[in-house]
Amino acid sequence: MTLAHPPSASFRHRLRSPLALLAGLLSPLAFAPWGFWPLMLASIALFWLSLHSATRRQALLRGWLYGLGMFGFGISWVHVSMHDHGGTPMSLAVPMTGLFAAGLALFPALLAWLAVRFAPQDGPSPLLFAGAWVLLDVLRGWMLTGFPWLYAGYSMIDTALSGLAPLGGIWLLTLTTVLTGAALGSALLRRRAALPAAVLALIGWGAGLATDPLDFTEPAAAPTRVALPQGNIPQDLRWQLSMRQATRDIYAELTASIPPEHLVIWPESALTEFADDAADFLLAQGQSLAEQGGALISGIPTREQRGLQTHYFNSIAVLGGGEGLYHKQKLVPFGEFVPLQSVLRGLIPFFDLPMSSFTPGSPEQLNLLAMYMVVSPFICYEIVYPELVADRAQDSNVLITISNDAWFGTSAGPHQHFQMARLRAVETGRWLLRSTNNGITAIVDPHGAVVAQLPQFTRDVLLGEFVPMTGHTPYMRLGGTPVWGLALALCLSALVRRAATRARVDH
């Protein structure tokens, strides 16, 4: 007679690497456009469980697999810009995107290694796991040019946790989210170590619920009318010389349909020509709106002669009804500048995209003035940098962000981008006006609610109202430093507990 045996420990360990990969694949479903936020908690819990009883080498592999699943799925839209609009063969675009995801996966790999390397005898500490997660997110958003995408807290924007954003920004949302997931994973093993993380997570959820309805800022003026034209010009046609006049005609026609006394915001590089070449047209449009009690703000490429060298900028300008010019600071690698261009230029079309030789703007630039309001401008993915937005919003009444997400087609990329922009409104207690070429064009209130939105891939004008705001949220005053300090304190507390446990065992 043959007796059945339970699965061996080695077999269970072999299952934990696929479990880590599965956990990573689940996490993007928690973000827009899907928004199944409980999957983020499940993803974190499964990731934490996969590290239980792991060696350091196993932890490194499982963390990397988690990151590969998360980024491989979550930013798969990168290949769309490479292939559809960058002229890169699919046989190259997919591996290049995979290589990018594999590099980003090194951050979760380091997290997993740290969690196991400094784990107490009963397994990884949920406190150290959560604290290190946040600190590595900070590093990922800063290292090289930074890639602050898919932070866990963004998945919670439509939950009670969004009330934490004015207090500690995306960092406090992420810390509470990871504490919750790690506590759930630890509780499944019936470990007492789950208790401190669970208590902190409950405090976070309670604080979010309590502060969600509160207003940290107040109206500075009466509601203002705004109009956001969405030209919906196909990306493969935008930069063709034959489209220049057609593009002018499209925006002139859309703008002519707007009633008087509106702040009109055209999207990023609305005109695919330099501002000095289109000066007469732009000034005429701005003057017409100013005479009607409105103002025009437009994205436009600009150039500036500095000595013998010409510098090119991705800019946004007020043209009538105000004043100001802002040059984009955070440039997109390969899209707006090419690292190691002496080596990479000419290798494949993706390294020679139109307008990929921009110069970054100075951090000392002033905000814009339009219709007697101070406007904080952000171009494209500048809006995903929380500290940049909180800093520039200090003396402003409203946030505006202009973008052209046509690069990413019907993928999840534009939805993730918009979700992050919404949280900037909550962090700063200000309305956010988002003007894009083909979507997502929208008006967002200071609590992150979408007040009005145009469908993607349509040519139309979004009309609405917003309220200029004044005041500062705690996050604007203090930035992310208090939460980073808390994350570090959680790591240190876990190390102290580990040392104390070892001391008791030795004695």
Locate predicted features.
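Membrane-embedded alpha-helical bundles of multi-pass enzymes
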Residues: 2-215, 256, 410, 421-424, ...
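Soluble catalytic domains of enzymes that build or remodel membrane lipids, polysaccharides, and related
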Residues: 213-482
